[in-house]
Amino acid sequence: MGSNKIWLRAETKPAEARSALTPTTCKALIDAGYEVTVERSTQRIFDDDEFAKVGAPLVEEGSWVKDAPKDAYILGLKELPEDDFPLEHVHISFAHCYKEQAGWEKVLSRWPRGGGVLLDLEFLTDDAGRRVAAFGFSAGYAGAALAVKNWAWQLTHPEGEPLAGEKPYANQDLLIQSVKESLQAGQKQSGKSPKILVIGALGRCGKGAVQLAKDVGIPESDIIQWDMEETKKGGPFKEIVEDADIFVNCIYLSSKIPHFVNVESLSTPSRRLSVICDVSADTTNPNNPIPVYNITTTFDKPTVPVTLPNGTQGTPLSVISIDHLPSLLPRESSEMFSEALMPSLLQLKDRENARVWKQAEDLFNQKVATLPQTA
């Protein structure tokens, strides 16, 4: 079951520059006796040469399908390209098919059909039930950055032109500088700083959103931090609609909860809210607590307008629902994630005796058992 072969596949999602391994963690695995193969990539934040220099052989993008040894772990981040061929390898990635997302049966059924296994990164947990590695902080940070930019953009583009596309930033300082410039332009128009309300503020993702707000100079008095205590009475919450300019949703959705906002609550003439950033991006989840949009946005087109009933007064309102926000800061987010994942990766040789991987495989088998017969 265990193997010392790891094959880092190239990401195929547009604008996805992150990597499950960095040159540093790749070297640490090689030093520990692992055979690490790296697919070339034109979009990864790390150059191919950086991996070659630490001793990893480079192979062509997508070559894992035909060339990877049967016992190699196929390591990646985002979901595989849509396809139908059965999967025979053990894959380690975020597959987004365990919470009955749209099309989950088609995605998940590829592994049992090929005799392969999915070890989903989203569900790797430690003894206390906490995720061993997550992009939460980076997601919240990037989401809040785009939300502030969108708030300012709406003020400086009153004719309703949507927020321009964004490309990944080489480092965090460049992102902060860009957001500060937008913020100043927005403040010049409005004469004030935006009020930003973060739900899930005590979690990793929420802490990232709050930190961005502080880093770009939004006063603490304008950063409203909510968590389970503030939301336990159940929404919709008029405070989100009437007290905040920007709402950043950072919760981890595990069950049905009352809506935070909905079309009805947003239709009040007292609405102040103009930007929603749904970092959780549970767009197709039937329990989405922000049921005012139905598409996942992209870095090319970061926002989607919210359609309110005819005659509704007030400022424009748009949603950011990008589902790979940490790729806005690919270097820092990859380094943070890969470093946190390392202790688990180092157990892959002896996977059958490693709790984190045994638990991941048990969960895979449980989910496979729920597949409809036709999948």
From Swiss-Prot:
Any single GO BP term: protein import into peroxisome matrix
- Positions of L-saccharopine binding: R18, K78, Q101, R131, F135, S280, A281, D282
Q: Which residues form the active site?
A: K78 (proton acceptor), H96 (proton donor)
Choose one Gene Ontology CC annotation of this protein and give it: cytoplasm
Q: Which InterPro entries would you find in this protein's record?
A: AASS, AlaDH/PNT_N, AlaDH/PNT_NAD(H)-bd, Lys1, NAD(P)-bd_dom_sf
* Known catalytic reactions: L-saccharopine + NAD(+) + H2O = L-lysine + 2-oxoglutarate + NADH + H(+)
Q: Which GO terms describe its molecular function?
A: mRNA binding; saccharopine dehydrogenase (NAD+, L-lysine-forming) activity; saccharopine dehydrogenase activity
- The record's EC number reads 1.5.1.7
Q: Which family does it belong to?
A: Belongs to the AlaDH/PNT family.
Q: Cite the record's note on assembly.
A: Monomer.
PANTHER family documented for this protein:
SACCHAROPINE DEHYDROGENASE, SACCHAROPINE DEHYDROGENASE [NAD(+), L-LYSINE-FORMING]
Could you tell me what this protein is called? Saccharopine dehydrogenase [NAD(+), L-lysine-forming]
Quote the gene name from the UniProt entry: lysA
